[in-house]
UniProtKB/Swiss-Prot annotation:
Disulfide bonds: C41-C44, C102-C130
Protein name: Disulfide bond formation protein B 1
Keyword tags: Cell inner membrane, Cell membrane, Chaperone, Disulfide bond, Electron transport, Membrane, Oxidoreductase, Redox-active center, Transmembrane, Transmembrane helix, Transport
PANTHER family according to UniProt: DISULFIDE BOND FORMATION PROTEIN B (PTHR36570:SF3)
Transmembrane segments: 15-31, 50-65, 73-89, 145-163
Encoding gene, per UniProt annotation: dsbB1
Compartments, as annotated in UniProt: Cell inner membrane
Gene Ontology biological process terms from the UniProt entry: protein folding
GO function term, MF aspect, one: electron transfer activity
Pfam families xrefs: DsbB (PF02600)
Species assigned in the record: Pseudomonas putida (strain ATCC 47054 / DSM 6125 / CFBP 8728 / NCIMB 11950 / KT2440)
Functional note: Required for disulfide bond formation in some periplasmic proteins. Acts by oxidizing the DsbA protein.
Amino acid sequence: MNEQTSRLNRERRFLVLLGLICLSLIGGALYMQVVLGEAPCPLCILQRYALLFIAVFAFIAAAMPGRRSLTFFEALVVLSAIGGIVAAGNHVYILANPMVSCGIDTLQPIVDDLPLAKLWPLAFQVDGFCSTPYPPILGLSLAQWALVAFVLTAVLVPLGIYRNRRQA
């Protein structure tokens, strides 16, 4: 096995791990929704979509045989993470400023009309308000943790690409 193949395999393992972490985060959100009764708002659902897109694109990227196709799907992972940053950042802003509403009247029908909301309503249908504060986990709200995860994804994936390919 040459050096370039070894580096690409390391990238693929990282992407599989990233996909599993994203699916675990969705599972944690579902646990909090079903067991702890924390109803998801439109921005929470959009963050779940971003996590799902990151996981799907990461798994597809890990299965790609060539470097070019791997890079294409890694770019889609980063774009999905940027979408998650927008949703989570907006949610963090709303939680910091409770007088601001997330627009439940305007966002809820749009989010509820997305295909996965009809296929799997438990996970992707809006039930709550964005301004509802829930108990923090290790000092941060769920939206803040999601923002951290999305920022790390948006930074670490391109950094890994650069690191693995600069000498290849």
